[in-house]
Amino acid sequence: MAKKRVIRCLIIILTIVLAGVEMFWLSRRKTIKQYKESQAAFGNPLMGYVPSAWYNEVSEDISLLYMDITWAELEPEEGVYNWASIDEENQISRWRKEGKHLVLRFVCDIPSDEEHMDIPEWLYEKSGEAGRWYDGEDGKGFAPDYNNPTIISCHRKAVRAIGEHFGQDGLISYVELGSLGHWGEWHVNYSEGIQRIPREAVRDKYILPWTEAFPDAM
């Protein structure tokens, strides 16, 4: 019994010694770096603030860029998509070659200084001019009626087309749930008489097409 106790103690001591030796060598291999405070922007892979895709100059460590597309520029005629202009403006070929990724937002209403629409003219007419023109503190523009069945149906087709064009090679890493509200931010200035963002059941009809078009994006 005493012999077993001695052996057990020796094993424990040996284990402690070996652990101490290992920790000693690991501490000697440790590298300590000191960084100076800086206000410069630096890359943070696939996260954080990102520059716009149309920027001509971005630092090499930037891996993610931002692209928004208005419905008016995407589909000037029903079923006809303006890919050549969109790809050129956002330098899609360049970013693919450089291995960059994009954040995408689809927008239907961007207030500005001038009266305008960010949905196509054909959709405005096809939906029975469903929505409201506004001129307020956010700017001027047209807020579509997102409850309109025609707009919902055509939105689904537009998103499917975007997925077919951009969703095949991992270029789009993130899809921002735009589509609804000013700047695609899911809010409107309803105090100016603009119809509120629709209820959840209708909102889902604007969300689900994106999950189908970009199943691998976040």
Where are the model-predicted features located?
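Extended amphipathic alpha-helical segments with heptad-repeat/coiled-coil character used for oligomerization
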Residues: Q39, G43, L180, E185-M218
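An active-site-proximal structural segment forming one wall of the substrate-binding cleft
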Residues: Q91-R96, K100-L102, E125-E176, E200-A213
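Membrane-interface motif at the C-terminal end of an N-terminal transmembrane signal
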Residues: G20-K33
